[in-house]
């Protein structure tokens, strides 16, 4: 194969080739001589052995978030992995789990990434584990977040988790109960030694003026029920975080909607890895999605959103894809002060989507403590602190290996 210089040299392909079928096709079709893997090996160091043996379903896939392998550098850390807590800590956490000193009956409330990760490890260590999920499907927020086509990496990770749960049920007698709402009465009746709460967040739903008359829906609800956007041509999304921006891309590209995203801060998707943030902003602009930063919602109406928008020339360009965003504790000497030129306006909307994030829901956790529903009670994942897959999986892993 010739390189783009026309010289006969080996060509190595790298980047988003972390699935054996894609990597093999690239070599077979003559697109490259070799495939180089980096992030996929952080997610699963045994990638090559599993692929060679044909155990593709057992490969833990990289989800492409770059939060552990890249963003941790910005925060002063070292390479990690959102889906593999051992990465970077191999000496601290052996590859083989240590059997539990005392076998316990454990209930896990919530089948998201934190709940599943804990349940798998605890069961493999010898505990009797029962995993409860209130919906018909495991995955929690990643089940919803993986709906857009661009989130195929997350869908593959969810499929991997489901496969691991299936194997754990067969080999380690993990019990799984879907469509089950856990109550204090149920926990009292079962008398578990330990209860692990991992049931996620409460959506933030501000008391905007006029919300009773507005055609309003939560972003997560819309992802699960896209039919609710039928007949809506102009859609306004309130919240310019990653959920709001990914939902905007989904609506514009998969349903052909006219979408506007409102963000009160100067930048969209604060805290997201610069590369991922930049790519999504680029495609939002390409898709015709309107991004309004420094824009504060004042009231909602049946046919639109009333806002106060800072239209000063000093407001950052929301489509600036490669502007590095430093952590809040690091001052940027190159950043210019933003002046205020506030203009009140109404943005037309047939449908208003709230994507303002969530907050930890600790209600049941504290109730369980007050009623002494188990000898040991723990709170992990988003129900402890709203975060990313990285924090959810890492926290669950750390608890599961020592309980």
Give the residues covered by each predicted segment.
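A structural motif corresponding to the C-terminal end of an alpha-helix
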Residues: 1-10, 31, 164-176, 287-290, ...
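Rossmann-like dinucleotide-binding cores of NAD(P)H-dependent redox enzymes
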Residues: 128-175, 248-297, 384
């Amino acid at each position: 194969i010739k390189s783009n210089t026309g010289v006969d040299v080996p060509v190595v392909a790298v980047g988003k080739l972390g699935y054996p079928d894609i990597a093999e096709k690239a070599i077979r079709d003559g697109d490259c001589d070799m495939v180089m893997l980096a992030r996929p090996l952080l997610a699963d160091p045994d990638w090559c052995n599993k692929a060679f043996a044909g155990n593709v379903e057992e490969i833990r896939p990289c989800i492409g978030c770059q939060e552990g392998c890249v963003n941790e550098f910005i925060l002063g850390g070292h390479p990690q992995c959102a889906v593999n807590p051992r990465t970077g800590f191999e000496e601290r956490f052996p590859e083989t789990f240590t059997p539990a000193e005392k076998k316990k009956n454990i209930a896990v409330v919530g089948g998201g990434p934190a709940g599943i990760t804990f349940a798998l490890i605890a069961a493999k260590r010898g505990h009797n584990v029962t995993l409860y999920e209130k919906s018909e499907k495991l995955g929690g927020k990643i089940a919803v977040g993986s709906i857009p086509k661009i989130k195929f990496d997350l869908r593959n990770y969810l499929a991997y988790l489901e496969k691991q749960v299936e194997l754990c049920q067969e080999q380690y007698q993990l019990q799984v109960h879907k469509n089950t709402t856990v109550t204090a009465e149920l926990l009292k009746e079962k008398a578990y030694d330990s209860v692990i709460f991992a049931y996620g967040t409460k959506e933030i739903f501000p008391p905007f003026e006029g919300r009773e008359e507005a055609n309003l829906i939560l972003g997560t609800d819309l992802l699960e029920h896209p039919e609710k956007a039928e007949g809506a041509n102009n859609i306004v999304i309130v919240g310019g975080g990653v959920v709001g921006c990914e939902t905007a891309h989904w609506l514009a590209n998969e349903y052909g909607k006219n979408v506007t995203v409102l963000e009160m801060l100067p930048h969209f998707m604060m805290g997201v890895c610069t590369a991922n943030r930049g790519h999504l902003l680029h495609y939002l602009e390409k898709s015709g999605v309107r991004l309004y930063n420094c824009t504060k919602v004042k009231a909602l109406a049946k046919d639109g959103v009333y806002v106060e928008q800072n239209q000063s020339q000093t407001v950052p360009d929301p489509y600036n894809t490669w502007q590095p965003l430093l952590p809040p504790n690091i001052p940027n000497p190159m950043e210019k002060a933003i002046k205020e030129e506030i203009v009140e306006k109404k943005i037309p909307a047939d449908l208003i989507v709230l994507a303002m994030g969530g907050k930890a829901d600790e209600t049941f956790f504290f109730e369980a403590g007050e009623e002494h529903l188990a000898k040991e009670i723990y709170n992990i994942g988003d129900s402890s602190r709203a975060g990313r897959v990285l924090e959810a999986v890492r926290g669950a892993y750390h608890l599961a290996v020592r309980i």
